[in-house]
């Protein structure tokens, strides 16, 4: 395995981590106006992700930075061609951060309701658009001989791209519902579990159709296995949610996301951005990678700092592992409403 291939695999792992961790953040934000019946419950839902949401976004920054450094041609074509959807995603992520900071600053139901709506919007847009973007990358986009994207926004809003967006939206919502059930107690936890079962009834057929179409059009024997495993994991998560086994259900949805990313990246190989204009114009791992020396330096940096980051993030999740119960008190500091877990059992 050469270094370019190593970094292609590592970028796939980074996206997997981002979708697993930020996926339940998006899901909680999407469900906030519907699952939380009053301000106390909505505050409790926000508190489940309060200590970790910003750390989860580090995976996105790392994936983007790794793409820029290891595959500069891929980064240039991707971010110039997809600039509008990526700009919308960036704006939505900024809105989410502002919501966490400002929601509890004013004692006004109207103020908080408006920020809850903004948090919903800032969660649903990335959840939808990430699926649209990755589906189009696998499908192939119009790229000319100079590796310049020649399409427009409507080019990306094809039926396959929109189906991919609906799949990620459904999976992240399901992931967030199960996470809420896992991290809370009482009626809120039970309501989240029931919601997860209902969302799964939409997520399972959507994911099945998307994976089937993907494998029929772009698949290969190895990714047939990962696609089938993703479907099994999703069905297993649904069964676990029905039986009230939130831990197993969360593991199932996490595995579904990891295996789905593995399927998409496996189908991409050896391309990183296929051209629908001509296969000769496609960006590949070989022609889009950085110089060998750059990849060597990056590999040593990753070897040193990746374990440190993983250890810190693992410690964060361990510290805030307890379930949250009841309306949480107001936060005395800036940031999400409460940054300390409140009572409850592990």
PLM feature spans:
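Hydrophobic alpha-helical transmembrane segments
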Residues: 156-171, 291-309
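Membrane-interface helix-loop-helix modules in multi-pass inner-membrane proteins
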Residues: 52-123, 144, 221
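Juxtamembrane membrane-water interface segments of multi-pass membrane proteins
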Residues: 28-51, 68-74, 101-113, 174-194, ...
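Long, contiguous internal "core" modules enriched in hydrophobic/ aromatic residues
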Residues: 102-249, 260-266
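Juxtamembrane non-transmembrane "cap" segments at the membrane-aqueous interface
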Residues: 258-280
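Short, membrane-exposed interhelical loops at transmembrane-helix boundaries
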Residues: 275-297
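Alpha-helical transmembrane segments of integral membrane proteins, especially early/N-terminal helices
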Residues: 13-16, 20, 44-58, 81-91, ...
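N-terminal signal-anchor module of multipass membrane proteins
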Residues: 1-55, 61-64
């Amino acid at each position: 395995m050469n270094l370019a291939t190593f970094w292609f695999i590592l970028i796939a792992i980074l996206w997997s981590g981002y979708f697993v961790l930020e996926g339940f953040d998006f899901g909680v934000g999407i469900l906030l106006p519907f699952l939380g019946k009053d301000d106390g419950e909505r505050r409790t839902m926000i508190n489940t992700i309060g200590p970790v949401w910003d750390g989860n976004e580090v995976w996105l920054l790392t994936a983007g930075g790794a793409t820029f450094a290891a595959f500069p041609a891929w980064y240039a074509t991707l971010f110039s061609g997809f600039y509008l959807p990526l700009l919308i995603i960036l704006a939505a992520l900024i809105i989410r951060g502002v919501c966490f900071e400002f929601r509890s600053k004013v004692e006004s139901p109207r103020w908080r309701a408006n920020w809850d709506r903004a948090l919903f919007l800032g969660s649903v847009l990335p959840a939808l658009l990430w699926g649209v973007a990755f589906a189009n990358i696998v499908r192939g986009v119009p790229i000319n001989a100079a590796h310049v994207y020649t399409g427009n926004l409507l080019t990306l809003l094809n039926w396959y791209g929109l189906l991919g967006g609906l799949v990620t939206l459904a999976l992240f919502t399901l992931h967030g519902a199960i996470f809420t059930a896992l991290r809370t107690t009482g009626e809120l936890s039970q309501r989240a579990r029931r919601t997860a079962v209902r969302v799964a009834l939409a997520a399972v057929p959507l994911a099945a159709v998307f994976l089937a179409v993907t494998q029929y059009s772009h698949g290969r024997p190895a990714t047939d296995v990962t696609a089938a495993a993703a479907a099994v994991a999703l069905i297993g998560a649904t069964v676990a949610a029905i039986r009230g086994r939130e831990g197993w259900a969360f593991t199932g949805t996490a595995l579904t996301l990891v295996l789905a990313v593995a399927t998409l990246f496996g189908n991409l190989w050896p391309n990183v951005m296929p051209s629908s204009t001509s296969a000769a114009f496609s960006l590949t791992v070989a022609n889009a990678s950085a110089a060998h020396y750059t990849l060597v330096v990056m590999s040593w940096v990753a070897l040193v700092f990746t374990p440190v980051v993983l250890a810190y993030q693992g410690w964060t999740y361990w510290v805030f592992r307890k379930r949250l119960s009841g309306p949480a008190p107001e936060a005395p500091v800036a940031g999400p409403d409460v940054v300390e877990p409140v009572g409850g059992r592990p």
